[in-house]
């Protein structure tokens, strides 16, 4: 088993190291604003038609453009979901969603969370899936990457308040990166058996002689961007555990590579754009080390099996509950770590059925801010927040003004960094407390005790950090959870983007100073160790009490010599 786990993990990392530098080169050109000559005329025509002046913006105008763009997306998607019963491409005749569910879904997909309180095959028309959710899968990913582009330019430029043009960045990210990759990946998925059609559902006769209705739909096209954009919202309720979304071991590997591809490539792009590739490598090392340890922990926990069955003298050969036989324990455990490390939220197994420790690690990866690879764009700007915090702490220890990439880190940047880092944990803990204090929140818990607490904690960890995966034992399709989680998703997304853009605006005005003898090198093993320590320290101090009440308590209960009544 150890050899199989090592081979699976090694193959994933190898494919990423082959593909990501190539994509990183393309992304660095977009960050540097280098136009593609073949598309220059088309772009200029588009700007004129849309009334866009492609001049560079300062951080306030850039931020307002991103916020307005996403607000418009919420309004349009909400209207589409409410009116889907009156619109075409609805062969099953699904009615419009209830208003609170429509709002929750609109906020979820615009914020790149893709939290789903519904089952797609029984709730949404093809038009809603394609023109609504599919479009936002592209645009929400592009928004996160655009914010990162602005922050990288702030580090790379010298005393220049401009950070690029938001509309140009959104267009180029979507057209030059997301669309081509999605087209290629969707064709690979179709070759593996992922369906792509707009036919009505098919009634078939099962082996037992009964009738079964098979859902259809344009799955492959949505599956590709769901993964590449670290969105995670499945076409079907079972997500990537469904054989029409993820039919083979090869498609499963492709999905994991697709989830990590953009976050990895952005690390290479960051190094190229700031003029020192070692900076990107250091961040990639930091992410990779935490990821490898987390993957090993989950694989080990799931291979140990269910303690209840072991107490009965039953050899369970590992914990296969909630997992697909075509993937097995190792691939399911690795997928769980990939999807929660990368803020994707897609699942090929039910996380609620993992062992207590096997479920705790994915939850903790979300709670530390989705910075271990993280979402498209959001993962790297989240990691850069921890870099600034690490530089500040190191500066205090050696008595020097902190600086990073030649730019002084002053009180304003530290305050904004602290604000951005603290908002998601505050949302997780406050939201969980409100849910547990209210009858409407407690009534959705069907598993009392430590596991029920874990389900609530996982839900708010997922929403606040824009992941979207869930412990399925919590009934969240209620007005209480739909509205509260929608608010948490909004603040968790834009409550971080706003201070990140403020930091970018402040850094852009500063000159880059050459490194001196006392400058802390931010690309070596020492800095990587300091950065990992800062991430672990912040995560541990914030969530150890809550985790002790949930998965840790559950693990202690499960490992007792007898089964609890």
UniProtKB/Swiss-Prot annotation:
Subcellular localization, as worded in the UniProt entry: Cell inner membrane
Keyword Transmembrane helix in record: yes
Sorted UniProt keywords: Cell inner membrane, Cell membrane, Ion transport, Membrane, Potassium, Potassium transport, Transmembrane, Transmembrane helix, Transport
Superkingdom per UniProt: Bacteria
Transmembrane segments: 6-26, 63-83, 132-152, 175-195, 250-270, 283-303, 327-347, 354-374, 379-399, 418-438, 483-503, 524-544
One GO term describing the cellular component: plasma membrane
UniProt cross-references to InterPro entries, sorted A to Z: KdpA
A Pfam match: KdpA
GO molecular function, one term: potassium ion binding
Membrane topology field: Multi-pass membrane protein
Family, per entry: Belongs to the KdpA family.
Function field: Part of the high-affinity ATP-driven potassium transport (or Kdp) system, which catalyzes the hydrolysis of ATP coupled with the electrogenic transport of potassium into the cytoplasm. This subunit binds the periplasmic potassium ions and delivers the ions to the membrane domain of KdpB through an intramembrane tunnel.
Subunit relationships: The system is composed of three essential subunits: KdpA, KdpB and KdpC.
NCBIfam families (alphabetical): kdpA
Official protein name in the record: Potassium-transporting ATPase potassium-binding subunit
Source organism of this protein record: Edwardsiella ictaluri (strain 93-146)
Organism placement in taxonomy: Bacteria, Pseudomonadati, Pseudomonadota, Gammaproteobacteria, Enterobacterales
């Amino acid at each position: 088993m150890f050899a199989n786990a090592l081979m699976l993990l090694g193959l994933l990392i190898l494919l990423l190291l082959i593909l990501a530098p190539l994509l990183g080169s393309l992304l660095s050109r977009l960050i540097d604003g280098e136009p593609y000559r073949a598309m220059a005329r088309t772009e200029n025509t588009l700007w004129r038609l849309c009334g866009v002046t492609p001049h560079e913006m300062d951080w306030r105008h850039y931020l307002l453009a991103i916020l307005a763009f996403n607000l418009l997306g919420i309004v349009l998607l909400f209207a589409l979901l409410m009116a889907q019963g009156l619109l075409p491409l609805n062969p099953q005749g699904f009615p419009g969603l209830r208003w609170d569910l429509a709002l929750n879904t609109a906020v979820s997909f615009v914020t790149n969370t893709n939290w789903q309180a519904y089952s797609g095959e029984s709730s949404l028309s093809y038009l809603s899936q394609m023109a609504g959710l599919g479009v936002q899968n592209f645009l929400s990913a592009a928004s996160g990457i655009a914010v990162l582009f602005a922050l990288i330019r702030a580090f790379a430029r010298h005393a220049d308040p401009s950070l690029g043009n938001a509309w140009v960045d959104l267009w180029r990210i979507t057209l030059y990166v997301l669309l081509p990759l999605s087209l290629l990946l969707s064709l690979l998925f179709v070759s593996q058996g992922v369906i792509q059609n707009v036919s009505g559902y098919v009634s078939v006769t099962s082996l037992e002689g009964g009738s079964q209705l098979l859902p259809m739909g344009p799955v492959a096209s949505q599956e590709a961007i769901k993964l590449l954009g670290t969105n995670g919202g499945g076409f079907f309720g079972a997500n990537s555990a469904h054989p029409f979304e993820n039919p083979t071991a090869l498609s499963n590997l492709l999905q994991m590579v697709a989830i990590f591809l953009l976050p990895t490539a952005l690390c290479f792009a960051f190094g190229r754009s700031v003029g020192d590739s070692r900076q990107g490598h250091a961040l990639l090392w930091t992410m990779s080390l935490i990821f490898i340890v987390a993957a090993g922990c989950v694989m080990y926990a799931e291979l140990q099996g269910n303690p209840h069955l072991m107490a009965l003298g039953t050899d369970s050969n590992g914990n296969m509950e909630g997992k697909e036989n075509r993937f097995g324990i190792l691939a399911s455990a690795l997928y769980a770590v990939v999807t929660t490390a990368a803020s994707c939220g897609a699942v090929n197994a039910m996380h609620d059925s993992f062992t207590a420790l096997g479920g705790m690690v994915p939850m903790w990866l979300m709670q530390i801010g989705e910075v271990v690879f993280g979402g498209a764009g959001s993962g790297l700007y989240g990691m850069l927040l921890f870099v600034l915090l690490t530089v500040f702490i190191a500066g205090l220890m050696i008595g020097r003004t902190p600086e990073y990439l030649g730019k002084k880190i002053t009180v304003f940047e530290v305050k904004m960094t602290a604000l951005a880092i603290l908002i998601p944990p505050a949302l997780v803990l406050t939201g969980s407390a409100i849910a547990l204090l209210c009858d409407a929140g407690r009534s959705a818990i069907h598993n009392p005790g430590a596991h029920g607490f874990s389900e609530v904690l996982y839900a708010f960890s997922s929403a606040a950090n824009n992941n979207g995966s869930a412990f399925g034992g919590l009934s969240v399709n209620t007005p209480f959870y739909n509205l509260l989680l929608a608010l948490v998703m909004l603040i968790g997304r834009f409550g971080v983007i706003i201070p990140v853009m403020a930091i970018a605006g402040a850094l852009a005005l500063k000159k880059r100073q050459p490194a001196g003898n006392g400058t802390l090198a931010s690309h070596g093993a020492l800095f990587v160790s300091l950065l990992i320590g800062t991430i672990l320290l912040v995560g541990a101090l914030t969530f150890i009490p809550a985790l002790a009440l949930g998965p840790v308590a559950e693990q202690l209960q499960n490992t007792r010599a007898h089964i609890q009544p």
